[in-house]
A protein has these predicted regions:
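N-terminal catalytic cores of secreted or lumenal carbohydrate-active enzymes
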Residues: 1-133, 150
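Alpha-helix capping and helix-loop boundary segments enriched in small/acidic/polar residues
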Residues: 2-5, 56-64, 98-101, 136-143, ...
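Short, well-ordered loop/turn and helix-capping segments at boundaries between secondary-structure elements
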Residues: 17-20, 75, 112, 154, ...
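Short, well-ordered loop/turn elements at secondary-structure boundaries
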Residues: 40, 105-106, 162-163, 209-212
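Solvent-exposed, flexible loop/coil residues
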Residues: 43, 119, 139-143, 201, ...
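Glycoside hydrolase catalytic-domain groove-lining segments
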Residues: 64, 68-71, 75, 79, ...
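Aromatic/acidic polysaccharide-binding cleft in carbohydrate-active enzymes
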Residues: 114, 164-236
């Protein structure tokens, strides 16, 4: 859901449009557009990266917005939303603490983003041209995710001892410079065995924390960052 530049009314109407089977303006608009039966929608992210590109917000401000926006995202006709708050970027433990304290069980899940990346300014390095030092640095950065998870989980445990709020690491993976000759900003990168080892080691860590982690999503499935599939026109 667009919390950064959208309104509460807009998000509420999108939820109604997708999930209501009733006789209402938004459900009728969906029918007019060719879809009679409502969709089943489970996961609803209320904002994304609200600390950065999703609004450059303070955690206290976002927590108040989450409470407001999520209140109007209603359950229609047997569809129950699993509402997810926009969580921290890697080492921002204050963000998690503020949201757990101020939002608490108004959210079903809290997201977290962690990338194996050299930094956010300048070159991130080649996806395919690297030396032994680059390789071992990448493995070390990848394995740091365990310490990050432990610290976020400890904060969540302080406010939610029964672990009813899920942690969802919904963006993770390697991030390199775009492949030469591709469109800048489209984040098209090749994979090597280095990336495969990052995926394997990261998944191994995730399996240790399944009491709290209920979803993880590599970024992304096709043609962007550590993707499973690369396509070009009709070729895969």
């Amino acid at each position: 859901g667009n919390v950064g530049s959208g309104t509460v009314e807009e998000l509420a109407k999108w939820v109604e449009y997708m999930t209501s089977d009733g006789d209402s303006p938004m459900a009728n608009l969906r029918r007019k557009n060719g879809r009679d039966k409502a969709w089943k929608l489970k996961y609803l992210g209320v904002g994304n990266e609200s600390w950065g590109c999703g609004g450059s917000m303070r955690p206290e401000y976002y927590a108040d917005l989450y409470r407001r926006y999520s209140t109007y995202c209603r359950n229609y006709d047997g569809n129950r939303l699993f509402k997810i708050a926009s969580g921290a970027s890697d080492y921002d433990y204050k963000w998690t603490d503020v949201l757990m304290n101020r939002v608490g069980h108004r959210m079903d899940g809290l997201s977290l983003h962690y990338y194996t990346v050299t930094g956010w300014s300048g070159s991130k390095g080649s996806a395919t041209q690297f030396n032994k030092d680059d390789y071992y640095w990448t493995m070390g950065k990848c394995l740091e995710v365990e310490d990050v998870l432990k610290k976020h989980c400890t904060i969540m445990d302080k406010y939610d001892k029964d672990k009813k709020i899920a942690l969802l690491l919904d963006e993770w993976g390697t991030w390199w410079d775009e492949e030469p000759g591709t469109i800048k900003g489209h984040l098209y990168q090749q994979n090597t065995l280095r990336d495969a080892f990052v995926a394997s080691l990261t998944l191994d860590v995730f399996h240790k924390y399944t009491d709290r982690i209920k979803m993880t999503n590599i970024a992304q499935i096709a043609n962007v960052l550590q993707s499973m599939i690369l396509t070009k026109e009709d070729k895969m």
